[in-house]
């Protein structure tokens, strides 16, 4: 860079630094019109803004789900134990512990289809189960 360019840039920076927020906003609009562009926020900033908007923005659907075992009738415990062992791969002792002191999360970070299938199997065995997005 030449000395003239550097000096003119420094002068420009000083001038811009002295502008008020309203003047900067007006400058932004003028530049958008002159150059036929828009000042779009980066994707991450837009996502953060949408998360902060709460009820205004539609929530994105979860991709990971947790299956919760809520209730097991005493007469259905053996059937539910078999399903818990099948879907979790746990040994008998751990599966038995899983069915006591409910509610307990049986499966975490699983796909929606897998969560639905797991809940269906548990309900068919007589348990009360549900899933929710993480």
Swiss-Prot record:
Domain of life of the source: Bacteria
UniProt-recorded name of the protein: Large ribosomal subunit protein bL12
GO biological process, one term: translation
Cysteine-cysteine disulfides: none
SUPFAM superfamilies: ClpS-like (SSF54736), Ribosomal protein L7/12, oligomerisation (N-terminal) domain (SSF48300)
Database matches in Pfam families: Ribosomal_L12 (PF00542), Ribosomal_L12_N (PF16320)
UniProt keyword Plastid, yes or no: no
Subunit structure: Homodimer. Part of the ribosomal stalk of the 50S ribosomal subunit. Forms a multimeric L10(L12)X complex, where L10 forms an elongated spine to which 2 to 4 L12 dimers bind in a sequential fashion. Binds GTP-bound translation factors.
Protein function: Forms part of the ribosomal stalk which helps the ribosome interact with GTP-bound translation factors. Is thus essential for accurate translation.
Record's keyword terms, sorted: Ribonucleoprotein, Ribosomal protein
Family in the record: Belongs to the bacterial ribosomal protein bL12 family.
Protein source organism: Chlamydia abortus (strain DSM 27085 / S26/3) (Chlamydophila abortus)
Keyword Ribosomal protein belongs to the record: yes
HAMAP family with a match to the protein in the record: Ribosomal_bL12 (MF_00368)
NCBIfam families linked: L12
MF (Gene Ontology): mRNA binding; structural constituent of ribosome
Any one annotated GO CC term: cytosolic large ribosomal subunit
InterPro entries: Ribosomal_bL12, Ribosomal_bL12_C, Ribosomal_bL12_C/ClpS-like, Ribosomal_bL12_oligo, Ribosomal_bL12_oligo_N_sf
